[in-house]
């Protein structure tokens, strides 16, 4: 572009002080020729459009051939800043329409040479390299003394034309557009990332996507390394962020049984249960494994929960001495029998155990004298008072149980109404539930009152074997320190329960369930 320039004056002296506004380095005039624009004149003279308009008292960008313009070159006030995003794209011009030159890592120090009208900065980085970045992703400014002479960088000639600048300004008004293209993560106060870390403990606000960006791993890899079936993570969860740590990150079955908050971590997100009384509020956290059907790969497969029996237990023995922490369910599981059989062998009427008790765990249940001459009312087969029935002491009349056909149908129908509703700790319904809140609510709709916690519900029911279990019975699970979960049995090995994925069907023998199954209870 050819222009006629006539030097008018040169400043006699320049006063430069730290933190002062830019000072005039020299002054000249140019005569506008056909085809000239303010933007082109500014580029040729090492200044900006705003400086030209201010020096010549222009209110628009319109100029005409023959017009004389005063041009002032400015000594830029250089500022040292650092990249506040995780990664920041450096472009060839001031706007997202320009090509990406490189990307700078968070914390990289740069020198701001100038600021454009759209908020973008021309920067110097590395060994004298220049480019443009969005100024909103620079922070920690340290102001240096102004340079004595103006620098016009060659890269400035690659700036877009004024019409493109206007387009860029519109885009900058939409933060999402810039965020997606130029800053991987825009947290200005993010702590330094340990790039050598192999695991990460989840904190409030963390997401799988944020961790993938932070550690440079894909979301798919993180989910694979941690056996996650969804992108849901929870505070305190230990996440492998490098493949080398994948085998060591399955949450351990760790039980903390101290009151008032008992928390167990096995292989899945937390399921918690709240107990409310009129005078106090006791919080009980129940943690389950991933609730999934038998056709789903569950995170529980990767967990190595501590086995219930101690390694020294002789499973061939016919008796067992009760130790601290034992339950009938755990003992039954150890010796391959059922709770009801152990109770029958030992004449137990409740599930309460005392440390030191010696229990029979194998043998034949003694026959019961079933002569009904003294108890004719137990005869359910005919009207002859001399007939015998089996086990008259056990009343199997299902009309006296909540599990009879009509009651069971009503209970299951009520449970099905809530399929898909959300889980919440302490949820009593009808919009959200925890496990025992769900069973309490469903039974209450049929006029049956249950205790509020799963442990209390287990204690209040009559225990039945799986072969005796009927739809409408309760099914209980123990993860190592007592009853921790309850669902409503619907038959065929299925239950409806409230767990961390909401109210849903689950296979009681499926992955993450079968190894923790204690047994069934009838209300």
UniProtKB/Swiss-Prot annotation:
Biased composition (Low complexity): 157-167, 251-282, 290-318
Entry EC number(s): 3.4.-.-
Residues of the NlpC/P60 domain: 405-523
The protein, known as: Probable endopeptidase p60
Location of the LysM domain: 28-71, 198-241, 318-361
GO molecular function annotations of the record: cysteine-type peptidase activity
GO biological process, one term: proteolysis
Region (Disordered): 146-188, 251-323, 367-408
Active site: 435 (nucleophile), 485 (proton acceptor), 497
Name of the coding gene: iap
Keywords per UniProt: Hydrolase, Protease, Repeat, Signal, Thiol protease
Entry function: This major extracellular protein may be involved in the invasion of non-professional phagocytic cells by Listeria.
Similarity section: Belongs to the peptidase C40 family.
Annotated ranges, domain SH3b: 78-142
């Amino acid at each position: 572009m050819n222009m006629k320039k006539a030097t008018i004056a040169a400043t006699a002296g320049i006063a430069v002080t730290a933190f002062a506004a830019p000072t005039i380095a020299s002054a000249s005039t140019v005569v506008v020729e056909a085809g000239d624009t303010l933007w082109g004149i500014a580029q040729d003279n090492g200044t900006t459009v705003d400086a030209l308009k201010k020096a010549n008292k222009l209110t628009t960008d319109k100029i005409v051939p023959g017009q004389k313009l005063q041009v002032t070159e400015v000594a830029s006030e250089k500022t040292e800043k650092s990249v506040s995003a995780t990664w920041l794209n450096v472009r060839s011009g001031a706007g997202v329409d320009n090509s990406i030159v490189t990307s700078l890592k968070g914390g990289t120090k740069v020198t701001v040479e100038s600021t454009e009208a759209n908020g973008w900065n021309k920067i110097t980085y590395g060994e004298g390299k220049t480019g443009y970045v969005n100024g909103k992703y620079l922070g920690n400014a340290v102001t240096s003394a102004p340079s004595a002479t103006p620098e016009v960088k060659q890269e400035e000639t690659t700036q877009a034309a004024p019409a493109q600048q206007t387009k860029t300004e519109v885009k900058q008004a939409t933060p999402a557009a810039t965020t997606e293209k130029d800053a991987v993560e825009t947290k200005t106060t993010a702590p330094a990332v340990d790039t050598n870390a192999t695991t990460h403990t989840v904190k409030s606000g963390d997401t799988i996507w944020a961790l993938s960006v932070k550690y440079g791993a894909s979301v798919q890899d993180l989910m694979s390394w941690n056996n996650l079936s969804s992108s849901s993570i929870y505070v305190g969860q230990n996440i492998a962020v490098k493949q080398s740590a994948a085998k060591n990150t399955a949450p351990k079955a760790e039980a903390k049984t101290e009151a008032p908050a008992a928390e167990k971590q096995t292989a899945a997100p937390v399921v918690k249960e709240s107990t409310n009384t009129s005078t106090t509020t006791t919080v009980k956290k129940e943690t389950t494994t991933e609730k999934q059907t038998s056709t789903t790969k569950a995170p529980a497969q990767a967990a190595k929960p501590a086995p219930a029996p101690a390694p020294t237990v002789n499973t061939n023995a016919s008796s067992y001495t009760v130790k601290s922490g034992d339950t009938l369910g755990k003992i039954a599981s150890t010796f391959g029998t059922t709770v009801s059989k152990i109770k029958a062998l030992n004449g137990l009427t409740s599930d309460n155990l005392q440390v030191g008790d010696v229990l029979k765990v194998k043998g034949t249940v003694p026959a019961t004298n079933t002569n009904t001459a003294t108890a004719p009312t137990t005869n359910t087969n005919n009207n002859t008072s001399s007939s015998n029935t089996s086990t008259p002491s056990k009343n199997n009349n299902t009309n006296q149980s909540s599990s009879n056909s009509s009651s069971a149908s009503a209970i299951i129908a009520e449970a099905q109404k809530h399929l898909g509703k959300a889980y919440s700790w302490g949820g009593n319904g009808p919009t959200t539930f925890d496990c025992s809140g769900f069973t309490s609510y469903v039974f209450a709709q049929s006029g049956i009152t249950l205790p509020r916690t799963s442990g209390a519900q287990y204690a209040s029911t009559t225990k039945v074997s799986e072969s005796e279990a009927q739809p409408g019975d309760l099914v209980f699970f123990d993860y190592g320190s007592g009853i921790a979960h309850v669902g409503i049995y619907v038959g065929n090995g299925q239950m409806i329960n409230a767990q961390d994925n909401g109210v849903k069907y689950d296979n009681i023998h499926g992955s993450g369930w079968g190894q923790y199954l204690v047994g069934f209870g009838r209300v």
